[in-house]
Amino acid sequence: MLRFGVNQKTSLLLTALLSCGLLIFSPVSQSSDLNQIQKQIKQQESKIEKQKREQAKLQANLKKHESKINSVEGELLETEISLKEIRKQIADADKQLKQLEKQEREQKARLTKQIDIIYRSGINPSLIERMFAQDPTKAERMKVYYQHLNQVRIEMINNLKATQAQIAVQKKAILSQQKNHRNQLSTQKKQQQALQKAQQEHQSTLNELNKNLALDQDKLNTLKANEQALRQEIQRAEQAAREQEKREREALAQRQKAEEKRTSKPYQPTVQERQLLNSTSGLGAAKKQYSLPVSGSILHTFGSIQAGEVRWKGMVIGASAGTPVKAIAAGRVILAGYLNGYGYMVIVKHGETDLSLYGFNQAVSVKVGQLVSAGQVIAQVGNTGEISRSALYFGISRKGTPVNPAGWVR
């Protein structure tokens, strides 16, 4: 006797029903399946929305921590400047103290010599009285000499006392400065601890963010969105810069016309005005004529794969956190702030068509609209944005298209 499993029985039953034309798909069955699919779609959409909210929250926390690091870095710079000034004051005070101590030793030596002269001469009031009885004229001369020696000795003693008083004041000042120095060091240590804590929080947030963005497609979408946001921000910033330059050039032309009319002499522009006039020149042809904005090893080259089909539109240079970032050429700052994916970003406009971009910074040192010169410090290397180690993102754009920066820098 043959035994059939459940699946075999079901299969035979379906075959029989189909052969008899008794099995049909009713509208009720189709509607149920559609409802189930729609339910699954809604659940998936809800899940995606939840992930997006979590990602937005993490991005906000990341920006908050990086802003805190930026603030603490500024405080550390101020403390370092203050400490340098205090150390200079202590060094100056110590130098003055050594001069006073040398002066004290010399005064003591002169006073000792003077006392020795008086002692060896044997001159004293009782001797002078006896000489008056014997030879008044000689006694008078001896009296004047004795008074002179005594006056010199008194002046030496007074000078020595004054020097010793100055030494006491100087030592007190040094002790006070040393106390201030210790307080400043303590403050700096606390600031460094606060910075380390903020960096740890930043790293923790970044790790959590990377975990949520583990899927390549999610990261790819994020990178595309960041890239698009950067393009839009550049377009907006370029337009604003063009309008600002136009206003400034018109104002300069009016000043030049008015000044030449008033003085009947050719107008001599200021340093800033000359910088404005020279800002029309771009970066020129790619001849490796500029220095790198920061020294370090090249972690990613232009055109190498960043994620999926997205490629790096610039180079990434590894460097220690806090390393000064320098503008490669003169120009106008059109962006100085935080951008998702790029962290604290500075973009400098060179002429009408060229831009240089500096990202992943932990702090920026310039403002939008500011004219900068070649080699001027504009930021500090960091690991803001979506990068796990301290490095600088450096790119060049010409006529709105990213180009390989390696052709311009050496």
Curated annotation (Swiss-Prot):
Skewed-composition ranges (Low complexity): 188-198
GO biological process terms, semicolon-separated: septum digestion after cytokinesis
Stretches with biased composition (Polar residues): 178-187
Entry's Gene Ontology molecular function annotations: metalloendopeptidase activity
Residue segments, region Disordered: 178-203, 236-272
InterPro entries noted in UniProt: Cell_wall_metabolism_enzyme, Dup_hybrid_motif, Peptidase_M23
Sequence ranges of Basic and acidic residues compositional bias: 236-263
Pfam families linked: Peptidase_M23
Name listed for the protein in its UniProt record: Uncharacterized protein HI_0756
Organism: Haemophilus influenzae (strain ATCC 51907 / DSM 11121 / KW20 / Rd)
